Curated annotation (Swiss-Prot):
GO cellular component: replication fork protection complex
InterPro entries given in the database record: Timeless (IPR044998), Timeless_N (IPR006906)
GO BP terms: DNA repair; DNA replication checkpoint signaling; meiotic cell cycle; replication fork arrest
Source organism phylogeny: Eukaryota, Fungi, Dikarya, Ascomycota, Pezizomycotina
Residue ranges, compositional bias (Basic and acidic residues): 320-336, 900-910, 981-995
Gene Ontology molecular-function annotations: DNA binding
Family: Belongs to the timeless family.
Gene this protein is translated from: TOF1
Provenance organism: Pyricularia oryzae (strain 70-15 / ATCC MYA-4617 / FGSC 8958)
Record's subcellular location: Nucleus
Protein name as catalogued: Topoisomerase 1-associated factor 1
Length: 1214
């Protein structure tokens, strides 16, 4: 061998030298032995060395150099096949020959392994070797299946046969490895096919599907596959997916309809296909010849065309002289559309399916025999085992195995149906009398298979794995068709099984949702996905419609309703509200059980019309429109599928407006009248022609009725727009919220209107809103009630006077005629005529206003009203009053009211004021009625629930508390005492001004000028009692400070009034009291000394003694550090709802007058204050044991707040 140039050689020279030396030492043809192949002395070791080179060099280093060298050395065709030929069947007992054959297959299996481009692992070296190795694999397959010296595939089975004969429990890992090695080799041979991007120079008939099937049949590979498949789960377990792959690559893309045809019928079918292709070609040529050039238009032609806007356009070519349509089309073709550049998407078509396969007569017969035997013996064991493997996600299960499983399931189900159909046409039975043909595929028609199918569909849809979803949809379609054939078979047992299967398939609402979502969300997944999707929708709707007609009481299970009920029950349990007693205590009540069963049945009842509407939205329509665009390439069954869908939308669902879009109308017109129309000889042409004609006719009529449709034809339609365009009114819906709110209550702006004028205004509003049907309904209800009560009044007038005086005694014993007369106290129930009216009675405020004006009343209160709440005509309304109300409505309809300044009737109404509503709600729900009496006339002050300056209704924007650290200041940054005092004074003035404004706005109003002597006397009496109690408390505390601790230990409580701070000046005391109310109830409060510098406590008490019981509990504020603390006491009986804590200071903590000016320190308390030796004093409230009374320390000297070494006093109070 000539030395290769290292710079040009794609393989390292040393690697090539090693491989070539191994090939030379393997053996060769001997001239002394009649040219037969003779093994070398160390052939077995050489074969093992080759395997090591492939495993440890190519696989470990992710290279293909060794495979490239072996292909160039022609090891497979020149050496390995010749070595296998030296092992005849007569020498099967030779262990050396068996080892050598096994070593040969250990080399051929990796050499024939499918080559895939992994973007994460592909290198430049792969791109150098892949095309060469793909062509080399085609040569390997040609040499293996056409080798005359020996049956190479049969020899592979002979190698694995000793391992297969060992029971599964006694097999060693080596036996398992040999079996899998041979099966993978067979899989590789079946899988090798010419790549789409490379041209094979040899004879493709030698490597075609027909040649492969012929080799598998001739060399008994089919028998081995059937043996392993039929014993799957017993003698074989982990080989299931390998057998499935072999079968998949043998039957994929094979036309099942032709598979079960005999020789003569097959030739006839192929002839019909050829005739159809010729007709299609002629049709294409006919359309092309209309625009094709002739010998008369060799010279150039240019035409000026004047457009609608007056501009001129130049068109070249003599075909522009033909007609206006051609000229417009040429102008459109001259326009260039440059869409935005997008990254090239991955191929959406299943890459392992390839193009359709045409088998010769011999291969067709062999494959049909294998399929029939496989269905009879191996289908159920193999596919049940594979389904279990998929469910448990076995480690040897690969991603593509799921898609192959569902594809083969669909393929064999269709094959079984075709076999039954062929046998029925020939009048023969395909199976034994005691075995139903559908029992042969029962392994994929059970509940476990449906669960696996549903799970795979959901996973593929969520993961956007469109190839797998395509196979799942095809499998689902074939299952439905098979079950439908079972239902139509005429066998009672099969019909029962089919009905049970359909019931389980259609019972889950999740399946309905998945089908609808798949149909609606097609984008650009490819034609295979589009074909499978439309086939599934067509089959699902057709079978579901037929089943729902036969089972009018069909039920579905919804997970949404279950989740809603669980959520509602959980919310009820959390809120602590008692559950309805009728659902718990009355479990044995048959009436309640019947009502619950009826409600559940009504909720679960299936309505096919409502379900079919889910396939009307624009997304589903666009899916079928995209499918119909391939009408030139679709067969009759596919064209029928699209035709039935458009017919269902336009005529069965009465939503033809969804098809009224410019591109859809243009497509439908071109299918019939366009330059590339459907072939008129097609069996579907007449159906499509009639459909298109009716759709365009409806479109023209709809444009006349709804001129707005001209604009809407440019856009897709949402549900609300489509409903309005189709029916002329908006869709009436009721809010699906948990607690729907009724319509707003209205009132008249003018209060001096009489009843007739009010009814006239309400009628005018309904007429202005085109809601005259509500008026008609109200009049009918009133008229019926008037007739009923007129008859009752007539009957009452006709009774004798004696009987009328003895109603209680005699009427009960009267004849049935007299007892049938309604009593005076019987109201008339107002019943809506349809659901839309019921929703209007609940939501339409103008209809509700009219109903109240004519005398209708609600049984339920406003707060508990629901859409199902009943309205009545009370019994106290006489027939004349009802007749008068009808007359007012008729008069207003005939002569609607007219108002000044061109105002409408709706302008005379307004919503009821918020103050009125709040007062009504407060009177209904508030228990504290004493505070509402004084504020009844105020304008909204009764809603003032919090103290002035308290927390607001908005979200708190307080920043989180920062950690307090000492900050070292430079000497130049320290503030002097004068500067600190000035800042404190400004801060105090600002706070006092703010509090004065709050107090003035909240407490000072017009009622302050009025005098109430009784209220004043009561107020001063309460203040006198408080002062007396406080003085008594002071005296007791001065005598014995530990007395309260002893009483607390003995279980006693002392009720004392709240201590009020005595500050200088009324305003200062009020501000201090309001600040105290905003603090945390458990926090400590600071009050001034008992003897303030500005005098007595009476003046301060009078201002600060404003009742605080109206203030609600607010959010606890941070604790504040005080200079001094005292004890906390509970409020008196009148103030039991809230505490007003105050503190006092002992004589030991007195300070100078300068320090008293700033006694409250606003620094927050520490979370764990230091303990001090104090006396605990805790006062409790006898009236409310739930109050959180905090034990407060006795007067304790706190650590003063310090900054930069100076002790700072608070400046919040003066």
């Amino acid at each position: 061998m000539e030395a290769s140039d290292g710079s040009n050689d794609v393989v390292h020279p040393e690697v090539r030298a090693h491989i070539n030396s191994l090939v030379s030492a393997l053996g060769g043809f001997s001239a002394d032995d009649d040219g037969r192949y003779k093994l070398g002395d160390d052939a077995l070791e050489v074969l093992r060395d080759m395997k090591k080179w492939i495993r440890f060099y190519d696989e470990k280093t992710n290279r293909m150099d060794v495979a490239r060298c072996l292909s160039e050395a022609n090891v497979v065709g020149g050496d390995l096949l010749q070595i296998l030929a030296t092992w005849p069947e007569a020498q099967s007992d030779s262990k050396f020959k068996a080892r050598v054959a096994l070593a040969c297959y250990e080399i051929m299996t990796p050499l024939t392994w499918p080559i895939e481009k992994d973007p994460e692992r592909t290198t430049v070296n792969h791109y150098r070797h892949m095309p060469v190795l793909q062509l080399a694999q085609l040569g390997y397959k040609r040499d293996i299946i056409n080798f005359d010296g020996a049956q190479i595939l049969h020899t592979a089975i002979r190698v694995a046969l000793p391992s297969m004969a060992v029971p599964i429990g006694d097999r060693t890992p080596r036996d398992q490895g040999i079996i899998k090695l041979v099966l993978y080799f067979l899989r590789n041979i079946a899988m090798i096919a010419p790549p789409p991007g490379l041209k094979y120079d040899g004879d493709e008939s030698q490597i075609s599907r027909s040649a492969t099937i012929d080799a598998f049949s001739y060399q008994d590979i089919f028998l081995a596959i059937l043996t392993i498949a039929s014993n799957m789960g017993e003698d074989f377990r982990t080989e299931d997916v390998i057998i499935m792959e072999i079968i998949f690559h043998l039957v994929k893309r094979v036309d099942i309809r032709k598979l079960f045809l005999d020789g003569e019928a097959l030739s006839k079918a192929k002839g019909e296909d050829l005739v159809a292709l010729i007709k299609k070609e002629k049709s294409m040529l006919r359309a092309q010849n209309k625009r094709a050039p002739t010998r008369h238009n060799r010279f150039g032609t240019m035409v000026w065309v004047q457009r609608a806007d007056g501009r001129m356009s130049a068109i070249s070519g003599q075909d522009a002289l033909r007609d206006s349509a051609t000229r417009e089309r040429k102008m459109d073709d001259s326009k260039t559309f440059r869409p935005p550049r997008r990254s090239r998407k991955a191929e959406m078509e299943p890459k392992d399916l390839g193009s359709p396969v045409s088998l010769n007569e011999r291969a067709n017969k062999q494959l049909r025999g294998f399929v029939e035997e496989f269905l009879d013996s191996g289908f159920n064991p193999l596919f049940q085992h594979i389904r279990k493997t998929i469910d448990r996600e076995a480690p040897y299960l690969l991603h593509q195995h799921r898609a192959q499983f569902f594809y083969l399931t669909a393929w064999f189900l269709q094959a079984e149906r075709e076999r039954i159909k062929t046998a029925k046409n020939q009048g023969s039975s395909t199976t034994q009398d005691d075995v139903s043909p559908f029992n042969l595929v029962a392994g994929v028609l059970n509940q476990e298979m449906f669960i696996t199918l549903s799970r795979a569909m959901d996973r593929a849809y969520n993961d956007k794995d469109w190839p797998e979803l395509t196979t799942v949809m095809r499998c689902f379609s074939q299952i439905l068709l098979t079950v439908q054939d079972m239902a139509d078979s005429g066998d009672e047992e099969n019909e029962d099984i089919a009905e049970n299967i359909l019931n389980r398939l259609f019972y889950e609402e999740a399946t309905h949702d998945a089908i609808a979502n798949i149909a609606r969300n097609f984008k650009d997944q490819g034609f295979e996905y589009l074909d499978a999707c439309t086939e599934l929708i067509h089959t699902y709707l057709r079978i579901l419609e037929s089943y729902s007609k036969q089972n009018v009481d069909m039920q579905v299970r919804s997970r949404k309703r279950t989740r809603k009920k669980k959520k509602a029950a959980k919310a009820t349990g959390e809120d602590g509200d008692p559950v309805d007693d009728t659902r718990i205590d009355d479990g044995d009540d048959s009436a309640n059980d019947e009502a619950s069963a009826e409600r559940t049945s009504r909720e679960r009842k299936f309505d096919f019309g409502r379900f079919a509407m889910r396939f009307v939205p624009q997304g589903v329509v666009d899916t079928f429109v995209q499918f119909t665009k391939y009408y030139r390439d679709l067969d009759d069954s596919q064209l029928k599928r699209a035709h039935r869908y458009f017919f269902r939308v336009a005529f069965k669902q009465d939503m033809s407006v969804m098809l009224f879009r410019v591109d859809i109308i243009h497509l439908l017109y071109n299918m019939i009248k366009g330059p590339e129309a459907l072939d008129k000889s097609s069996s579907m042409f007449k159906d499509w022609e009639e459909l298109v004609k009716q759709i365009i006719r409806k479109c023209v009529r709809k444009i006349e009725d709804r001129p707005a449709l001209i604009i809407e034809m440019l856009f897709s339609k949402i549900n609300s727009t489509a409903h309005y365009l189709e029916f002329g009114f908006e869709k009436q819906t009721i809010s699906g919220s948990a607690n729907p709110r009724p319509g707003a209550e209205l009132e008249f702006k003018k209060q001096d209107l009489n009843l007739e004028q009010q009814i006239a205004i309400a009628v005018g509003v309904l007429l202005d809103k085109n809601q005259a049907d509500h008026l008609t309904w109200v009049k009918n209800v009133l008229s019926n009630a008037e007739v009923e009560r007129r008859a009752w009044e007539t009957a009452q007038d006709a009774l004798p006077s004696v009987e009328s005086q003895n109603v209680e005694g005699d009427i009960e014993n009267e004849a049935p005629a007299a007892s049938s007369i309604p009593q005076d106290s019987t109201p008339t129930i107002v019943r809506p005529d349809h659901d839309g009216r019921r929703g209007a009675m609940f939501k339409n405020p103008h209809l509700r206003l009219l109903m109240r004006l004519v005398g209708f009343e609600r049984l339920a209160p406003s707060e508990a009203e629901t859409p199902e709440s009943a309205w009545i005509i009370p019994a106290n309304l006489r027939a004349d009053q009802l007749q008068e109300a009808v007359g007012h409505i008729n008069a207003a309809e005939f002569n609607p009211p007219v108002f000044d300044d061109d105002k409408s009737a709706e302008d005379q109404l307004r919503r009821k004021s918020a103050g009125t509503t709040s007062r009504r709600k407060k009177a209904a729900f508030d228990d504290d009625e004493e505070n509402d009496v004084d504020n009844e006339d105020d304008d909204g002050l009764e809603e003032f629930l919090f103290e002035p300056g308290g927390p607001t209704a908005r979200k708190s924007d307080v920043r989180p508390k920062k950690k307090l650290t000492r900050r070292k200041r430079s000497p130049g940054q320290e503030l002097t005492d004068e500067q600190q005092d000035e800042k404190a004074r400004l801060r105090r003035e600002k706070d006092l001004e703010k509090q004065r404004k709050i107090k003035s706005a909240a407490r000072v109003h017009s009622s302050d000028e009025e005098s109430d002597q009784e209220a004043d006397a009561a107020f001063f009496a309460r203040e006198k009692e408080r002062m007396a109690a406080r003085n008594a408390l002071y005296s007791r505390l001065a005598r014995n400070p530990g007395e309260f601790a002893a009483e607390k230990a003995a279980g006693k409580t002392t009720k004392v009034p709240v201590l009020l701070s005595d500050e200088s000046g009324g305003e200062d005391s009020v501000a201090a009291a309001e600040r105290s109310k905003r603090r945390k109830r458990k926090s400590e409060s600071v009050a001034g000394d008992e003897d303030d510098r500005d005098g007595g406590s009476d003046g301060g008490s009078e201002d600060a003694g404003t009742p605080a019981r109206d203030a609600p509990e607010t959010k606890p504020l941070p604790k504040r550090r005080k200079k001094a603390t005292a004890f906390v006491v509970s409020s008196d009986e009148e103030d039991s709802g809230d505490e007003a804590p105050a503190n006092t200071r002992g004589q030991s903590s007195q300070r100078s007058a300068a320090e008293d000016a700033m006694e409250t320190d606003e620094t927050p308390l520490s979370s764990s204050p230091h303990k001090t030796k104090t006396t605990d004093v805790e006062m409790a409230n006898d009236d409310d044991h739930d109050e959180e009374d905090t034990p407060v320390k006795a007067p304790t000297q706190r650590r003063p707040r310090a900054k930069a070494g100076f002790v700072l006093d608070s400046s919040d109070e003066e």
